[in-house]
Amino acid sequence: CYQIPALLRDGVAVVVSPLIALMQDQVDALDEVGVKAAYLNSSLTPEEASRVKDELLSGRLDLLYVAPERLMMSSMLSLLDRVNVSLFAIDEAHCVSVWGHDFRPEYGELELLRTRYPQVPRIALTATADEKTRAEIVGKLLNDAREFVASFDRPNIFYRIVDKRNIKEQLLNFIKYEHSGD
């Protein structure tokens, strides 16, 4: 849900993800199809983290994955102040809810993004939020949000394997010619 907008917008999309393994899986999958993605987390050596920061500052990344704890560090926010952030994607957004089983205080601190980066779009995603949790997510993280709620049964989803050539062009053509009215 956030990868397509990230690729269509100039700058780097910052993806807030709660788990290192999830970040690694996402970045590996994106690298495999030619998307420039990286993560900053405690699994990196200082040299690896420095290389990712250099890639970020030079504009070579499309997506950067970070945990909420790292994102809320003043050094990380200062780093992001120096780049063109295209959007913030808050994955597993149900973690913002004090009522949820996965509550993490730093998710609640992401409210800062609204005031520090008011011009940067935000998207919050979760598959496990009841109505009360969704209201809390919108109240803390988003402004005038549109909510999309669907069941797990998705008959509109199907798989097709396509050789990769120019990923951005293929993606734009797919949207333009196969989903222009969606």
Residue ranges with predicted function:
Residues 24-58, 139-141:
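Conserved helix-turn-beta segment of the N-terminal RecA-like "Helicase ATP-binding" lobe
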Residues 160-182:
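Conserved interdomain hinge at the start of the Helicase C-terminal
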Residues 44-87, 95-101:
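Conserved helix/coil segment N-terminal to the catalytic DExD/H
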Residues 20-22, 44-46, 69-72, 94-95, ...:
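Conserved nucleotide-binding/hydrolysis micro-motifs of P-loop NTPases
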Residues 11-14, 36, 60-64, 84-87, ...:
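Loop/turn-to-beta-strand initiation segments
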Residues 1-7, 23, 106:
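Motif I (Walker A/P-loop) of helicase-class P-loop NTPases
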Residues 81-149, 168:
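Post-DEXD/H (motif II) to motif III coupling segment of the RecA-like Helicase ATP-binding lobe
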Residues 13-23, 178-182:
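Conserved strand-helix element at the start of the C-terminal RecA-like helicase core
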